[in-house]
């Protein structure tokens, strides 16, 4: 599941003009993907967004390996229909926004495993993410959590690896947490939630973050927008793209304030602009400007809490 920030270059109109709203607004591309011999289930509006990150990872891997190289995503390209690969509704910025999330998550995961070599990675709303394949070190245990329909489809493209456990269920319940603690009672855990929390009310997200505190030795990293960014998402994005059925709610103005709302001794470890660590070499001027505007006003950010 994913939200991608939009550029301010006028989309496909060729018109350039600075619009701060467009620097954070996302496009949802609803696609049907079929594997031979498999009928894809009907996904709801939120589930349908799982295809956007795959397109971004493939695009970056083909054109901007300095941002992200994803061999597994490339290997799946020929299994996807041409209709999905026709990215006319997106542009360089929207595609690289998805790839940038993956690059950011990789950085946090690798840092966590350097600090906690016995740690576990749990991906919430994993969709068709290929994070495991980019970061597998040969011994770390991974868990991937998503809804049943999504997980069933994921298995057709990405069969369950030896060191990654697929868990079909509600990311906001404690079932997957209990499973992890049965398997590894005391191991440190990094929970990642890429492009997920936007779709849920604040109290729902806070309930999950508080629940993590109850299971001990847990950290969570996720991407978010700030209040002004969310306002733009609601005002422009849904009406423009005709996807009002995929509503968005959760935003973070201050990671420190979020930690106080969580309570339970939670603390904000990091809050950083989304594109801070992204190599912008070779990008179009409009893409660079969009990234710079987003970072200047902290419209999109990475948040790390434990």
Describe each PLM feature range.
Residues 175-185:
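Short amphipathic alpha-helix with an adjacent loop that forms part of the alpha/beta core around
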Residues 191-192:
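A conserved beta-strand element that flanks and buttresses the S-adenosyl-L-methionine
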Residues 231-246:
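Short, glycine-/aromatic-enriched active-site segment of Class I SAM-dependent methyltransferases
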Residues 31-122, 126-169, 180:
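Rossmann-like AdoMet
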Residues 199-211:
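A short, conserved alpha-helix within the catalytic core of class I
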Residues 266-293:
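Conserved catalytic loop of SAM-dependent methyltransferase domains
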Residues 216-227:
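Conserved beta-strand signature within the Rossmann-like core of class I S-adenosyl-L-methionine
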Residues 247-271:
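Short alpha-helix
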